[in-house]
Amino acid sequence: MTEDDFPPDKAARRPVSSRETGSEWQHTSRNLPQRRDLPAFQGSWSWLLLTLLSLGVLMFVFVAWQYLHDEPRGADDDLRPLQALDQTPVIQMPKKVKQFLETVAPFPSGTMPTTPPWLWETPTLSRFFKGNGAALDNLRDLLEDPDWHAAHASWHAADLGSDLRWSVVFVLKQAESAYLSRLGQEEGAFMAAIDLVNLAKRLEKIWAWPSFYSRALEAQELAAQTLAELLKQTRIPEATLRQYQRQFSLCLPSDEWLVQALGAFYLHEKKLLFGPASGEPLDTMPGGGQLERPRRLFFKPHSTLQLFVDQFRRLRMEAQAPLANTGLISVDNAISMHSRRFQPNAEGVAYCTNRMSAYRSLPARLGLAKARGALLVTLFAMRRCVVEQRTLPPSLESLRPKYLLDVPLDPFSAAPLHYDIRLGRIWSVGADLKSQGGAPTSPPMSDDKEPTVEIDIGITSTD
Protein backbone atom coordinates (compact mmCIF):
# COMPACT_ATOMS: atom_id res chain seq x y z
CA MET A 1 0.00 0.00 0.00
CA THR A 2 1.60 3.34 -1.06
CA GLU A 3 1.41 6.67 0.53
CA ASP A 4 -0.66 7.91 -2.35
CA ASP A 5 -3.55 5.72 -1.19
CA PHE A 6 -4.08 7.80 1.94
CA PRO A 7 -5.43 11.30 2.17
CA PRO A 8 -2.68 13.90 2.18
CA ASP A 9 -3.07 14.86 5.82
CA LYS A 10 -3.17 11.22 6.95
CA ALA A 11 -0.21 10.29 4.82
CA ALA A 12 1.86 13.04 6.33
CA ARG A 13 1.29 12.03 9.91
CA ARG A 14 1.48 8.29 9.41
CA PRO A 15 4.85 6.67 10.13
CA VAL A 16 6.21 4.68 7.24
CA SER A 17 8.05 1.47 7.83
CA SER A 18 11.12 0.44 5.91
CA ARG A 19 9.26 -2.57 4.60
CA GLU A 20 6.69 -0.42 2.88
CA THR A 21 9.34 1.54 1.06
CA GLY A 22 10.73 -1.50 -0.61
CA SER A 23 10.15 -2.33 -4.23
CA GLU A 24 8.37 -5.61 -3.40
CA TRP A 25 5.74 -3.86 -1.30
CA GLN A 26 5.07 -1.30 -3.98
CA HIS A 27 4.71 -4.04 -6.60
CA THR A 28 2.27 -5.98 -4.43
CA SER A 29 0.11 -2.96 -3.72
CA ARG A 30 -0.43 -2.38 -7.38
CA ASN A 31 -1.82 -5.93 -7.76
CA LEU A 32 -4.51 -5.57 -4.99
CA PRO A 33 -8.15 -5.31 -6.25
CA GLN A 34 -9.36 -1.78 -6.38
CA ARG A 35 -12.81 -0.76 -4.85
CA ARG A 36 -15.47 -0.19 -7.46
CA ASP A 37 -19.02 1.21 -7.17
CA LEU A 38 -21.99 -1.34 -7.31
CA PRO A 39 -24.18 -1.21 -10.41
CA ALA A 40 -27.41 0.81 -9.98
CA PHE A 41 -29.66 -2.05 -11.18
CA GLN A 42 -29.00 -4.09 -7.99
CA GLY A 43 -31.01 -1.55 -5.98
CA SER A 44 -33.99 -1.79 -8.39
CA TRP A 45 -34.07 -5.60 -7.88
CA SER A 46 -34.50 -5.05 -4.16
CA TRP A 47 -37.51 -2.81 -4.74
CA LEU A 48 -39.05 -5.34 -7.14
CA LEU A 49 -38.61 -8.15 -4.63
CA LEU A 50 -40.20 -6.03 -1.90
CA THR A 51 -43.14 -5.19 -4.18
CA LEU A 52 -43.75 -8.85 -5.05
CA LEU A 53 -43.56 -9.83 -1.40
CA SER A 54 -46.09 -7.14 -0.50
CA LEU A 55 -48.45 -8.31 -3.23
CA GLY A 56 -48.13 -11.89 -2.00
CA VAL A 57 -48.98 -10.86 1.55
CA LEU A 58 -51.92 -8.80 0.27
CA MET A 59 -53.18 -11.74 -1.79
CA PHE A 60 -52.87 -14.07 1.19
CA VAL A 61 -54.81 -11.65 3.39
CA PHE A 62 -57.51 -11.30 0.71
CA VAL A 63 -57.89 -15.08 0.29
CA ALA A 64 -57.92 -15.59 4.05
CA TRP A 65 -60.59 -12.88 4.35
CA GLN A 66 -62.66 -14.62 1.68
CA TYR A 67 -62.56 -17.89 3.62
CA LEU A 68 -62.98 -16.48 7.12
CA HIS A 69 -65.32 -13.52 6.63
CA ASP A 70 -69.05 -14.18 6.93
CA GLU A 71 -71.60 -11.84 5.43
CA PRO A 72 -74.07 -10.07 7.74
CA ARG A 73 -77.46 -11.68 8.22
CA GLY A 74 -79.96 -10.60 5.58
CA ALA A 75 -83.66 -9.83 5.87
CA ASP A 76 -86.07 -12.76 6.00
CA ASP A 77 -89.31 -11.27 7.30
CA ASP A 78 -91.13 -12.28 4.12
CA LEU A 79 -90.59 -15.95 5.01
CA ARG A 80 -92.16 -15.72 8.43
CA PRO A 81 -95.50 -17.63 8.50
CA LEU A 82 -98.66 -15.74 9.32
CA GLN A 83 -99.72 -18.27 11.96
CA ALA A 84 -99.31 -16.84 15.47
CA LEU A 85 -97.88 -18.93 18.28
CA ASP A 86 -100.54 -20.57 20.46
CA GLN A 87 -100.37 -18.95 23.91
CA THR A 88 -102.29 -21.68 25.75
CA PRO A 89 -100.29 -22.29 28.97
CA VAL A 90 -100.19 -26.09 28.80
CA ILE A 91 -101.54 -28.63 26.31
CA GLN A 92 -101.63 -32.42 26.50
CA MET A 93 -102.02 -33.28 22.82
CA PRO A 94 -98.33 -34.05 22.05
CA LYS A 95 -98.24 -36.36 25.07
CA LYS A 96 -101.47 -38.07 23.95
CA VAL A 97 -100.14 -38.54 20.42
CA LYS A 98 -96.97 -40.13 21.77
CA GLN A 99 -98.98 -42.46 24.00
CA PHE A 100 -101.21 -43.37 21.06
CA LEU A 101 -98.21 -44.30 18.89
CA GLU A 102 -96.89 -46.51 21.66
CA THR A 103 -100.09 -48.59 21.56
CA VAL A 104 -99.78 -49.39 17.84
CA ALA A 105 -98.94 -53.05 17.23
CA PRO A 106 -97.21 -53.49 13.86
CA PHE A 107 -96.87 -56.70 11.92
CA PRO A 108 -93.94 -58.90 12.91
CA SER A 109 -90.85 -57.93 10.97
CA GLY A 110 -91.05 -58.95 7.33
CA THR A 111 -94.60 -60.31 7.49
CA MET A 112 -96.61 -57.24 6.46
CA PRO A 113 -98.26 -57.79 3.05
CA THR A 114 -97.08 -55.56 0.24
CA THR A 115 -100.51 -55.36 -1.41
CA PRO A 116 -103.27 -52.90 -0.42
CA PRO A 117 -105.33 -54.06 2.59
CA TRP A 118 -108.48 -54.66 0.52
CA LEU A 119 -106.56 -57.43 -1.25
CA TRP A 120 -105.53 -59.19 1.96
CA GLU A 121 -107.07 -62.42 3.07
CA THR A 122 -109.84 -61.99 5.63
CA PRO A 123 -107.97 -63.75 8.50
CA THR A 124 -105.00 -61.40 8.00
CA LEU A 125 -107.30 -58.38 8.04
CA SER A 126 -109.07 -59.62 11.12
CA ARG A 127 -105.88 -60.27 13.12
CA PHE A 128 -104.37 -56.90 12.28
CA PHE A 129 -107.61 -55.00 12.90
CA LYS A 130 -108.52 -56.71 16.17
CA GLY A 131 -104.94 -56.72 17.42
CA ASN A 132 -104.93 -52.92 17.30
CA GLY A 133 -108.28 -52.30 18.95
CA ALA A 134 -106.74 -50.14 21.68
CA ALA A 135 -104.82 -48.05 19.16
CA LEU A 136 -107.96 -47.46 17.08
CA ASP A 137 -109.89 -46.38 20.18
CA ASN A 138 -107.11 -43.96 21.12
CA LEU A 139 -107.07 -42.52 17.62
CA ARG A 140 -110.82 -41.95 17.68
CA ASP A 141 -110.40 -40.06 20.95
CA LEU A 142 -107.71 -37.89 19.37
CA LEU A 143 -109.84 -37.10 16.32
CA GLU A 144 -112.80 -36.18 18.50
CA ASP A 145 -110.72 -33.35 19.99
CA PRO A 146 -111.54 -30.35 17.78
CA ASP A 147 -108.33 -28.43 18.56
CA TRP A 148 -104.90 -30.01 18.55
CA HIS A 149 -103.24 -26.62 19.24
CA ALA A 150 -101.04 -27.13 16.19
CA ALA A 151 -99.18 -23.82 16.71
CA HIS A 152 -98.23 -24.51 20.33
CA ALA A 153 -94.57 -24.58 21.35
CA SER A 154 -94.98 -28.02 22.95
CA TRP A 155 -94.87 -29.66 19.53
CA HIS A 156 -91.23 -28.55 19.17
CA ALA A 157 -90.05 -30.69 22.09
CA ALA A 158 -89.85 -33.94 20.11
CA ASP A 159 -90.08 -34.92 16.44
CA LEU A 160 -93.15 -37.13 16.73
CA GLY A 161 -93.74 -36.94 12.98
CA SER A 162 -90.63 -39.02 12.29
CA ASP A 163 -91.98 -41.99 14.27
CA LEU A 164 -92.07 -44.99 11.92
CA ARG A 165 -95.32 -46.19 13.47
CA TRP A 166 -97.26 -43.53 11.57
CA SER A 167 -97.04 -45.66 8.44
CA VAL A 168 -98.53 -48.56 10.41
CA VAL A 169 -101.32 -46.26 11.62
CA PHE A 170 -102.25 -45.29 8.07
CA VAL A 171 -102.32 -48.89 6.87
CA LEU A 172 -104.32 -49.80 9.98
CA LYS A 173 -107.07 -47.34 9.02
CA GLN A 174 -107.06 -48.78 5.50
CA ALA A 175 -107.34 -52.28 6.96
CA GLU A 176 -110.21 -51.19 9.19
CA SER A 177 -112.04 -49.79 6.18
CA ALA A 178 -111.41 -52.93 4.12
CA TYR A 179 -112.47 -55.23 6.96
CA LEU A 180 -115.72 -53.36 7.62
CA SER A 181 -116.47 -53.25 3.89
CA ARG A 182 -115.97 -57.00 3.69
CA LEU A 183 -118.45 -57.42 6.55
CA GLY A 184 -120.99 -55.35 4.61
CA GLN A 185 -120.67 -52.30 6.90
CA GLU A 186 -120.20 -49.75 4.11
CA GLU A 187 -120.79 -46.65 6.16
CA GLY A 188 -118.29 -47.78 8.76
CA ALA A 189 -115.79 -48.44 5.97
CA PHE A 190 -116.29 -44.93 4.58
CA MET A 191 -115.96 -43.38 8.03
CA ALA A 192 -112.65 -45.17 8.59
CA ALA A 193 -111.32 -43.67 5.35
CA ILE A 194 -112.71 -40.23 6.25
CA ASP A 195 -110.97 -40.52 9.62
CA LEU A 196 -107.71 -41.07 7.77
CA VAL A 197 -108.08 -37.96 5.63
CA ASN A 198 -109.12 -36.04 8.76
CA LEU A 199 -105.93 -37.22 10.45
CA ALA A 200 -103.97 -36.03 7.42
CA LYS A 201 -105.46 -32.55 7.82
CA ARG A 202 -104.52 -32.45 11.52
CA LEU A 203 -100.93 -33.39 10.72
CA GLU A 204 -100.76 -30.87 7.87
CA LYS A 205 -101.32 -28.03 10.32
CA ILE A 206 -98.44 -28.95 12.65
CA TRP A 207 -95.40 -27.04 11.37
CA ALA A 208 -93.04 -27.57 14.30
CA TRP A 209 -91.24 -30.33 12.38
CA PRO A 210 -91.19 -30.91 8.59
CA SER A 211 -91.91 -34.60 9.13
CA PHE A 212 -95.54 -33.85 10.05
CA TYR A 213 -96.25 -32.36 6.62
CA SER A 214 -94.74 -35.37 4.85
CA ARG A 215 -96.86 -37.67 6.99
CA ALA A 216 -99.93 -35.63 6.09
CA LEU A 217 -99.30 -36.11 2.36
CA GLU A 218 -98.75 -39.83 2.91
CA ALA A 219 -102.01 -40.19 4.84
CA GLN A 220 -103.92 -38.15 2.27
CA GLU A 221 -102.71 -40.39 -0.55
CA LEU A 222 -103.73 -43.61 1.23
CA ALA A 223 -107.10 -42.15 2.22
CA ALA A 224 -107.82 -41.12 -1.37
CA GLN A 225 -106.90 -44.56 -2.67
CA THR A 226 -109.12 -46.24 -0.08
CA LEU A 227 -112.09 -44.03 -0.92
CA ALA A 228 -111.61 -44.59 -4.65
CA GLU A 229 -111.76 -48.33 -4.06
CA LEU A 230 -114.89 -48.02 -1.90
CA LEU A 231 -116.66 -45.82 -4.45
CA LYS A 232 -116.38 -48.44 -7.18
CA GLN A 233 -119.21 -50.62 -5.88
CA THR A 234 -120.94 -48.53 -3.22
CA ARG A 235 -124.67 -48.79 -2.55
CA ILE A 236 -124.76 -45.94 -0.05
CA PRO A 237 -127.63 -43.44 -0.55
CA GLU A 238 -126.96 -40.16 -2.35
CA ALA A 239 -127.49 -38.05 0.78
CA THR A 240 -124.87 -39.99 2.72
CA LEU A 241 -122.42 -39.79 -0.15
CA ARG A 242 -122.98 -36.04 -0.28
CA GLN A 243 -122.04 -35.81 3.39
CA TYR A 244 -118.85 -37.82 2.83
CA GLN A 245 -118.00 -35.71 -0.21
CA ARG A 246 -118.27 -32.56 1.86
CA GLN A 247 -116.15 -33.97 4.70
CA PHE A 248 -113.49 -35.08 2.24
CA SER A 249 -113.47 -31.70 0.47
CA LEU A 250 -112.86 -29.86 3.75
CA CYS A 251 -109.68 -31.87 4.34
CA LEU A 252 -108.01 -31.31 0.97
CA PRO A 253 -104.48 -29.85 1.02
CA SER A 254 -103.95 -26.40 -0.46
CA ASP A 255 -101.18 -24.22 -1.89
CA GLU A 256 -101.60 -21.65 0.86
CA TRP A 257 -101.00 -24.19 3.60
CA LEU A 258 -97.77 -25.28 1.93
CA VAL A 259 -96.62 -21.69 1.42
CA GLN A 260 -97.06 -20.96 5.11
CA ALA A 261 -95.57 -24.30 6.14
CA LEU A 262 -92.43 -23.61 4.09
CA GLY A 263 -91.95 -20.40 6.06
CA ALA A 264 -92.15 -22.39 9.29
CA PHE A 265 -89.68 -24.94 7.92
CA TYR A 266 -87.27 -22.11 7.12
CA LEU A 267 -87.44 -20.96 10.74
CA HIS A 268 -86.80 -24.57 11.75
CA GLU A 269 -83.58 -24.62 9.72
CA LYS A 270 -82.60 -21.20 11.04
CA LYS A 271 -82.95 -22.43 14.62
CA LEU A 272 -80.85 -25.49 13.81
CA LEU A 273 -78.10 -23.16 12.57
CA PHE A 274 -78.13 -20.49 15.27
CA GLY A 275 -80.03 -21.88 18.23
CA PRO A 276 -81.10 -19.10 20.63
CA ALA A 277 -79.10 -16.61 18.55
CA SER A 278 -81.76 -17.01 15.84
CA GLY A 279 -84.00 -14.70 17.84
CA GLU A 280 -86.85 -17.21 17.97
CA PRO A 281 -88.58 -18.11 21.27
CA LEU A 282 -86.50 -20.45 23.38
CA ASP A 283 -89.37 -22.88 23.92
CA THR A 284 -89.60 -23.42 20.14
CA MET A 285 -86.03 -24.68 19.75
CA PRO A 286 -86.06 -28.06 17.93
CA GLY A 287 -85.93 -30.79 20.53
CA GLY A 288 -85.32 -28.20 23.22
CA GLY A 289 -81.74 -27.83 21.97
CA GLN A 290 -79.93 -24.67 22.98
CA LEU A 291 -76.66 -25.22 21.11
CA GLU A 292 -75.56 -23.11 18.18
CA ARG A 293 -73.97 -24.95 15.28
CA PRO A 294 -70.18 -24.61 15.82
CA ARG A 295 -68.17 -22.57 13.35
CA ARG A 296 -65.62 -24.40 11.25
CA LEU A 297 -63.53 -23.88 8.16
CA PHE A 298 -65.50 -23.72 4.90
CA PHE A 299 -68.76 -23.26 6.84
CA LYS A 300 -70.17 -19.74 7.14
CA PRO A 301 -73.40 -19.68 9.17
CA HIS A 302 -74.80 -16.43 7.78
CA SER A 303 -73.89 -17.26 4.19
CA THR A 304 -75.41 -20.70 4.67
CA LEU A 305 -78.58 -19.16 6.08
CA GLN A 306 -78.80 -16.95 3.00
CA LEU A 307 -78.74 -20.10 0.87
CA PHE A 308 -81.75 -21.36 2.82
CA VAL A 309 -83.49 -18.00 2.34
CA ASP A 310 -83.03 -18.18 -1.43
CA GLN A 311 -84.11 -21.82 -1.59
CA PHE A 312 -87.27 -21.40 0.47
CA ARG A 313 -88.26 -18.29 -1.47
CA ARG A 314 -88.02 -20.26 -4.69
CA LEU A 315 -89.99 -23.15 -3.23
CA ARG A 316 -92.75 -20.81 -2.11
CA MET A 317 -92.90 -19.34 -5.60
CA GLU A 318 -92.98 -22.83 -7.07
CA ALA A 319 -95.83 -23.87 -4.79
CA GLN A 320 -97.96 -21.04 -6.21
CA ALA A 321 -96.77 -20.96 -9.82
CA PRO A 322 -98.87 -22.48 -12.63
CA LEU A 323 -97.61 -25.86 -13.83
CA ALA A 324 -94.88 -25.79 -11.18
CA ASN A 325 -96.06 -28.97 -9.53
CA THR A 326 -93.77 -31.04 -11.72
CA GLY A 327 -90.89 -29.86 -9.54
CA LEU A 328 -88.67 -28.79 -12.47
CA ILE A 329 -87.50 -25.62 -10.72
CA SER A 330 -86.32 -27.53 -7.69
CA VAL A 331 -84.51 -30.17 -9.72
CA ASP A 332 -82.59 -27.59 -11.74
CA ASN A 333 -81.75 -25.70 -8.60
CA ALA A 334 -80.51 -28.82 -6.84
CA ILE A 335 -78.12 -29.46 -9.73
CA SER A 336 -76.78 -25.90 -9.58
CA MET A 337 -76.16 -26.19 -5.86
CA HIS A 338 -74.27 -29.48 -6.25
CA SER A 339 -72.03 -27.85 -8.89
CA ARG A 340 -70.54 -25.40 -6.37
CA ARG A 341 -67.21 -26.83 -5.32
CA PHE A 342 -63.97 -25.53 -3.85
CA GLN A 343 -65.41 -22.32 -2.50
CA PRO A 344 -65.05 -20.58 0.87
CA ASN A 345 -68.45 -21.87 2.06
CA ALA A 346 -68.23 -25.34 0.54
CA GLU A 347 -69.31 -27.08 3.75
CA GLY A 348 -72.24 -24.69 4.11
CA VAL A 349 -73.38 -25.39 0.54
CA ALA A 350 -73.16 -29.14 1.14
CA TYR A 351 -75.12 -28.80 4.40
CA CYS A 352 -77.85 -26.72 2.74
CA THR A 353 -78.06 -29.12 -0.21
CA ASN A 354 -78.49 -32.07 2.11
CA ARG A 355 -81.11 -30.37 4.28
CA MET A 356 -83.10 -29.03 1.32
CA SER A 357 -83.42 -32.47 -0.27
CA ALA A 358 -86.35 -33.19 2.05
CA TYR A 359 -88.20 -30.04 0.94
CA ARG A 360 -87.68 -29.90 -2.81
CA SER A 361 -90.26 -32.58 -3.59
CA LEU A 362 -93.04 -30.96 -1.54
CA PRO A 363 -94.56 -28.81 -4.35
CA ALA A 364 -94.66 -31.81 -6.68
CA ARG A 365 -96.13 -34.03 -3.98
CA LEU A 366 -98.73 -31.37 -3.23
CA GLY A 367 -99.62 -31.25 -6.93
CA LEU A 368 -100.28 -34.99 -6.92
CA ALA A 369 -102.29 -34.71 -3.70
CA LYS A 370 -104.43 -31.98 -5.25
CA ALA A 371 -104.92 -34.07 -8.39
CA ARG A 372 -106.03 -37.07 -6.34
CA GLY A 373 -108.33 -34.81 -4.34
CA ALA A 374 -109.91 -33.37 -7.49
CA LEU A 375 -110.41 -36.87 -8.90
CA LEU A 376 -112.05 -38.09 -5.68
CA VAL A 377 -114.41 -35.13 -5.40
CA THR A 378 -115.44 -35.69 -9.02
CA LEU A 379 -115.86 -39.42 -8.40
CA PHE A 380 -118.08 -38.72 -5.38
CA ALA A 381 -120.26 -36.48 -7.55
CA MET A 382 -120.31 -39.09 -10.31
CA ARG A 383 -121.45 -41.85 -7.95
CA ARG A 384 -124.16 -39.60 -6.49
CA CYS A 385 -125.40 -38.91 -10.01
CA VAL A 386 -125.44 -42.63 -10.83
CA VAL A 387 -127.33 -43.44 -7.61
CA GLU A 388 -130.05 -40.91 -8.42
CA GLN A 389 -130.23 -41.00 -12.21
CA ARG A 390 -129.11 -44.59 -12.88
CA THR A 391 -126.82 -43.41 -15.65
CA LEU A 392 -123.48 -41.73 -16.20
CA PRO A 393 -123.48 -38.01 -17.03
CA PRO A 394 -122.47 -37.15 -20.61
CA SER A 395 -119.80 -34.74 -19.35
CA LEU A 396 -118.30 -33.50 -16.11
CA GLU A 397 -119.87 -30.11 -16.68
CA SER A 398 -123.33 -31.71 -16.47
CA LEU A 399 -122.61 -32.52 -12.80
CA ARG A 400 -123.06 -28.84 -11.99
CA PRO A 401 -124.66 -27.46 -9.94
CA LYS A 402 -126.41 -30.30 -8.16
CA TYR A 403 -123.45 -32.57 -7.54
CA LEU A 404 -120.59 -30.09 -7.94
CA LEU A 405 -120.55 -26.36 -7.33
CA ASP A 406 -117.61 -26.12 -9.71
CA VAL A 407 -115.92 -28.79 -11.78
CA PRO A 408 -112.47 -29.34 -10.23
CA LEU A 409 -109.56 -28.40 -12.46
CA ASP A 410 -106.51 -30.51 -13.05
CA PRO A 411 -103.78 -28.81 -10.95
CA PHE A 412 -101.16 -29.77 -13.53
CA SER A 413 -102.85 -28.40 -16.65
CA ALA A 414 -105.27 -25.89 -15.07
CA ALA A 415 -107.86 -27.44 -17.43
CA PRO A 416 -110.79 -29.75 -16.65
CA LEU A 417 -110.03 -33.33 -15.76
CA HIS A 418 -110.32 -35.90 -18.56
CA TYR A 419 -113.42 -38.09 -18.63
CA ASP A 420 -114.19 -41.01 -20.91
CA ILE A 421 -117.78 -42.27 -20.60
CA ARG A 422 -117.05 -45.37 -22.71
CA LEU A 423 -114.12 -46.49 -20.58
CA GLY A 424 -115.74 -45.34 -17.35
CA ARG A 425 -112.71 -43.49 -16.01
CA ILE A 426 -111.55 -40.03 -14.98
CA TRP A 427 -107.90 -38.98 -15.01
CA SER A 428 -105.37 -36.19 -14.65
CA VAL A 429 -102.54 -35.49 -17.10
CA GLY A 430 -100.14 -35.98 -14.19
CA ALA A 431 -96.56 -34.91 -13.75
CA ASP A 432 -95.61 -35.36 -17.43
CA LEU A 433 -98.51 -33.14 -18.60
CA LYS A 434 -99.54 -35.73 -21.20
CA SER A 435 -102.91 -37.45 -21.55
CA GLN A 436 -102.88 -41.02 -22.82
CA GLY A 437 -106.41 -42.15 -22.04
CA GLY A 438 -105.97 -42.85 -18.35
CA ALA A 439 -103.92 -45.47 -16.54
CA PRO A 440 -105.92 -47.58 -14.06
CA THR A 441 -103.71 -48.99 -11.33
CA SER A 442 -103.95 -50.92 -8.10
CA PRO A 443 -104.05 -49.13 -5.77
CA PRO A 444 -105.93 -46.36 -7.60
CA MET A 445 -104.10 -43.19 -8.66
CA SER A 446 -100.66 -44.64 -7.96
CA ASP A 447 -99.28 -43.61 -11.37
CA ASP A 448 -97.81 -40.13 -10.92
CA LYS A 449 -97.75 -39.56 -14.67
CA GLU A 450 -101.50 -40.12 -15.07
CA PRO A 451 -103.52 -40.56 -11.84
CA THR A 452 -106.76 -42.33 -12.74
CA VAL A 453 -109.97 -43.40 -11.00
CA GLU A 454 -112.42 -45.93 -12.38
CA ILE A 455 -116.17 -45.45 -12.14
CA ASP A 456 -116.57 -49.21 -12.63
CA ILE A 457 -119.87 -48.96 -14.49
CA GLY A 458 -120.37 -50.75 -17.80
CA ILE A 459 -121.20 -49.00 -21.04
CA THR A 460 -124.70 -50.46 -20.95
CA SER A 461 -125.43 -48.28 -17.93
CA THR A 462 -125.18 -45.19 -20.10
CA ASP A 463 -127.80 -46.22 -22.63
Predicted regions and their residues:
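Short acidic linear motifs
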Residues: 2-463
